[in-house]
Every structure is written in C-alpha cells, then in structure tokens.
C-alpha cells in the first residue's frame, strides 16, 4: 500500500484541500480509509476500506478531484459497501435471490452526487451520474 510520500502530487493536493475546506470528509479519509494509486484505474473506486485512484483522477482539475474523493468517502460513511455485501449474501428484491451490484452502485452514485452538488463540494466530473428527478427521492 502506498504511503503519503508515494502518492502523486494531484492526490496529495486534493487531500490537503479536504483538510482545509472539508474537515468532516478529511477526518474520515485520514482515519478510516487508505488511498492506493494504481495508474490504470479507470475512474475511482472504494471497497469501504481503501480508495483506489489512478491517472484518470490525477488528470482532473482540483475541484473535480475534491468532489471525487468526497464521493468515495461518502460511500463508506453511508455504509454502501457493507449493505451491498449484505444484500449479495441475503438476496434482495422481489425474488430475494438476486442482487444487481451494478444497479446498486449507480443508485448510490446518483444519491451521493446529489448531496455533493447541493452542498457545493467541489465540481462533479462530466461523467458523474446526476439527475434532478432523483433529488430528495433516493434513500441509498
């Protein structure tokens, strides 16, 4: 696992911005999650314990990097990974034996992006999922 001095400057700058501008997210990031840098990571991802970032993240302007870091932290704060594991193990839905992880991830992304954009935390990348039809109607 990379340590702070092994992370590229764009990652360190985004983390420093969180410390100064968004201490709630920074405290969670610094105490509950690790950051790994894997250049070929297509966007960003988390398993609830580690956030994996790559060249895609580094190429973004700082406000987008801040948004993405807060997005990944919120997945953990809101328990999305834990609930996905539980639903996968138990089953979920009308037939109680199928859980669609892709659909779950998209739904939680819509929810998180709605929170972050309404709170004016960073700037969501163009690839982000956001639809005003879902504002205030999701409970992920």
Q: In which residue ranges do the predicted regions lie?
A:
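Short, functionally important secondary-structure microenvironments
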Residues: 1-66, 73-140
